[in-house]
């Protein structure tokens, strides 16, 4: 519905009577007068004005007024006859401003949200259907939405004389048209919702309705086509017996694996070919990502019993990221007796490949390569890094700075926003030789008309969506579904969809020879990588020309599986004796990886080499993006922290950390409704982290705490997060960890927001009543020394390998 309001009601100052004196008998009659501010003009006025709320039964609406410009006939007679302004010549129309009312639902019951699908267009909420279809899985199932949509609004033909449901023929026609539009959008935008082999009940239900209500219509043809497509896809998956990954052309079978001499074949592939093939694989996987799998409420369920197979498209992307990282490590460390200058050549080649990925706007493989080169087994090779050419070192610094964690990874976010939909990358390098080569390569691509898509680092979006899910409540007053939260989530999902569309610009061809070589690369565990690294350069090897220490500024994509805070200590520059192994069974290049098989905690409790974990774990507690990581719900069987023995020694300025929690690149810390930060009480709310005592405090869950929350409610929410629904909340007590020697037991009926200590970290424990308190395991935020060897043993046992 469009409602019209006097334009004067929207002016920034109160209207006053205006008089116009005209001397003489002649002149032009004044038909319309609009007062103007002497200081500002119309271009400074806001075209949208908040008008308040409208509350109905089961729904709350936000109402805004928007000024729109329309063309009307200048002649009164033409207006009276209903002539449309856009069909008249330019000289016969006048521009006028109209005010339209926009009603957007802020919260409501599921029934009202489904009903709004039919009325949103009339309320001028033009994006509602896309937002609902992209986010409804967080609060409803496909079957429940279909039941409400088709049974309640699609059965008018069966009604007989009931005015409450059976309206006029025109109304039925309008409802049928709206249903057709919704179903067509659903089938086009979310075909995965109907992937329910072998019977496909939801899709058959849609087909049954369309055959009865709209036979031969476009939505019906689309539904029939989708059914055939899903059946063919299911038959192919049954033949390969491997699910998602085996249908990828770069996932070769075991019989296709061949042993290849590593170094010879690595140098036999041109740098641009390697980057092109990595981009081909990443683009194929990213285009298959189902955007709603990234929602925090869905992604956080992956570790529950019924969620082991959830988000397969995200898992496939993470597995590919780890495979690239492992490939970088294996090519450098596999030749155990390699000389430093030869090892430096391999590193320089990977830096060149990373730059080629940058030219192709493949930020996923770019980050994987940089992350691997910054991992401890490679970063500790001081003599090797001393042999790397200065120009390559400078280029590596520039590529690393793209993923600087300062200001919530602002550099990478701005770069992604700037180049997300551009045809080519915008390169600016201080390394002269690389700059000339890159510009030449880029100019060649432009001359050939080969446009580039954009492959983002998916972890940024997962972090933002998880933070949104943690900070904003699912329900508001009266138990209504908080749909405003879904609008905020859709802002992030829309960016993912936009970049997926941009990936269609790539025109790449797979190279089977490269795939065979890539598939044949071993994936070393952190333990194995460190052993090989020590064989290349021993513990006592030092180079007088080693670059200055530099903190790693890149966290791997697999850190998104971390729900633990582990230990946040600063890293020393010196190396320390390595702890003896205790049976690590890792499959990745280091302890931060993802494998395609499940493992129990007992299988992944092995010891890994440890060092200062400042570069990764301090950032987990101090950088805002990593604050988002704290909110991820994970289990200890799928968590791991990247740890190593010595800080790499590349030059660069020290990292400065600043607290901010920008949820999307468009949000600012001062925007209204900004979610609270960890360790900060603001606007009567804060985020606390609750772990189980029997879990050694390693696995925590982030909880939104308000000034109204009492102890029993907080305990119940924490138990739900930790999958303890079957136990009684009265059997547990809430304890805040103050220091290694002190803790604060929150009283049973206290207001936790005011009872907690704000001078300590907001870290809490769930403890069974009557149990003896264990020694407090703190996640230090300021230690600058390496833990002793015996302390490292207990730390390593707390870090389990990431598996799917």
UniProtKB/Swiss-Prot annotation:
The keyword Nucleotidyltransferase does not apply. Residues 270-539 form the Ras-GEF domain. The keyword Chaperone does not apply. CDD domains: RA_RGL (cd17210), RasGEF (cd00155), REM (cd06224). Residues 581-607, 640-649 have a biased composition (Low complexity). It comes from the Eukaryota. Residues 101-231 form the N-terminal Ras-GEF domain. GO terms for cellular component: plasma membrane. Keywords: Guanine-nucleotide releasing factor. Residues 564-611, 640-676 are annotated as: Disordered. This is Ral guanine nucleotide dissociation stimulator-like 1. It comes from Danio rerio. The lineage of its organism: Eukaryota, Metazoa, Chordata, Craniata, Vertebrata.
């Amino acid at each position: 519905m469009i409602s019209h309001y006097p334009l004067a009601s929207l002016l920034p100052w109160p209207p006053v009577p205006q008089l116009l004196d005209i001397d003489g008998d002649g002149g032009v009659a004044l038909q319309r007068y609009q007062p103007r501010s002497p200081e500002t003009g119309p271009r400074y006025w806001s075209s949208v004005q908040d008008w308040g709320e409208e509350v109905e039964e089961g729904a709350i609406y936000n109402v805004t007024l928007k000024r729109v410009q329309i063309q009307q006939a200048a002649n009164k007679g033409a207006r009276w006859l209903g002539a449309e302004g856009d069909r008249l010549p330019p000289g016969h129309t006048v521009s006028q401003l109209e005010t339209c009312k926009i009603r957007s639902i802020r919260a409501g019951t599921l029934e009202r949200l489904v009903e709004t699908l039919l009325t949103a267009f009339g309320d001028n909420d033009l994006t509602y259907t896309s937002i609902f279809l992209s986010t409804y899985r967080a609060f409803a199932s496909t079957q429940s939405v279909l039941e409400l949509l088709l049974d309640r609004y699609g059965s008018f033909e069966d009604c007989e004389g009931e005015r409450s449901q059976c309206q006029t023929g025109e109304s039925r026609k309008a409802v049928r048209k709206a249903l057709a539009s919704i179903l067509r959008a659903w089938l086009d935008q979310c075909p995965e919702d109907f992937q329910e082999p072998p019977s496909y009940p939801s899709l058959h239900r849609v087909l049954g309705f369309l055959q009865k209500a709209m036979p031969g219509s476009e939505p019906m043809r689309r539904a029939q086509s989708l059914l055939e497509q899903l059946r063919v896809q299911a038959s192919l998956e049954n033949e390969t017996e491997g699910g998602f990954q085996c249908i990828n052309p770069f996932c070769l079978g075991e019989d296709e694996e061949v042993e290849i001499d590593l170094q010879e074949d690595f140098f036999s592939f041109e740098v641009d070919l390697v980057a092109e093939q990595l981009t081909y694989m990443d683009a194929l996987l990213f285009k298959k990502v189902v955007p709603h799998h990234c929602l925090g409420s869905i992604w956080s369920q992956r570790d529950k019993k019924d969620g082991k197979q959830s988000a397969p498209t995200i898992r496939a992307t993470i597995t590919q990221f780890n495979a690239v990282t492992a490939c970088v490590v294996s090519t450098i460390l596999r030749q155990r007796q390699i000389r430093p200058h030869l090892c430096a050549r391999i590193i320089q080649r990977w830096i060149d490949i990373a730059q080629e990925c940058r030219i192709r706007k493949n930020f996923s493989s770019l980050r994987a390569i940089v992350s691997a080169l910054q991992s401890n087994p490679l970063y500790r090779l001081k003599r090797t890094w001393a042999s790397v050419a200065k120009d390559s070192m400078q280029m590596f610094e520039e590529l690393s700075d793209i993923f600087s964690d300062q200001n919530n990874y602002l550099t990478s976010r701005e770069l992604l926003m700037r180049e997300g939909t551009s045809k080519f990358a915008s390169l600016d390098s201080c390394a002269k030789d690389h700059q000339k080569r890159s510009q030449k390569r880029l100019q060649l691509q432009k001359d050939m008309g080969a446009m580039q898509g954009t492959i983002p680092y998916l972890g940024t979006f997962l972090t933002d969506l998880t933070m949104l899910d943690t900070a904003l409540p699912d329900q508001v007053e009266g138990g209504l579904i908080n749909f405003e939260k879904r609008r905020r989530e859709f802002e992030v999902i829309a960016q993912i969809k936009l970049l997926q569309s941009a990936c269609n610009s790539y025109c790449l061809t797979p190279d089977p020879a490269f795939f065979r070589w890539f598939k044949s690369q071993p994936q070393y565990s952190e333990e194995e990588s460190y052993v090989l690294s020590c064989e290349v350069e021993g513990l006592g090897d030092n180079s007088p020309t080693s670059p200055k220490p530099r903190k790693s500024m890149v966290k791997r994509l697999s850190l998104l599986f971390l729900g633990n805070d582990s230990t946040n200590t600063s890293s020393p520059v010196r190396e320390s004796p390595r702890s003896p192994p205790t049976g690590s069974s890792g499959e990745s290049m280091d302890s931060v990886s993802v494998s395609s098989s499940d493992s129990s905690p007992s299988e992944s409790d092995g010891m890994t080499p440890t060092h200062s974990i400042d570069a990764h774990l301090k950032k987990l507690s101090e950088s805002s993006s990593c604050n988002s990581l704290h909110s991820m719900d994970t289990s200890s069987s799928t968590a791991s922290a990247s740890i190593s023995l010595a800080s790499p020694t590349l030059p660069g300025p020290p990292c400065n950390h600043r607290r901010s929690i920008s949820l999307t690149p468009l949000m600012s810390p001062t925007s209204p409704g900004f979610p609270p930060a960890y360790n900060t009480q603001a606007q009567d709310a804060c985020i606390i982290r609750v772990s189980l005592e029997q879990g050694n405090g390693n696995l925590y869950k982030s909880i939104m705490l308000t000034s109204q929350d009492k102890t029993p409610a907080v305990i119940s929410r924490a138990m739900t997060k930790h999958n303890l629904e079957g136990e009684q909340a009265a059997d547990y007590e809430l304890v805040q960890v103050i220091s290694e020697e002190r803790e604060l037991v929150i009283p049973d009926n206290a207001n936790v927001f005011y009872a907690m200590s704000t001078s300590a970290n907001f870290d809490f424990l769930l403890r069974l009543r009557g149990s003896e308190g264990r020694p407090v395991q703190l996640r230090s935020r300021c230690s600058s020394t390496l833990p002793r060897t015996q302390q490292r043993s207990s730390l390593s046992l707390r870090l389990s390998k990431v598996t799917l």
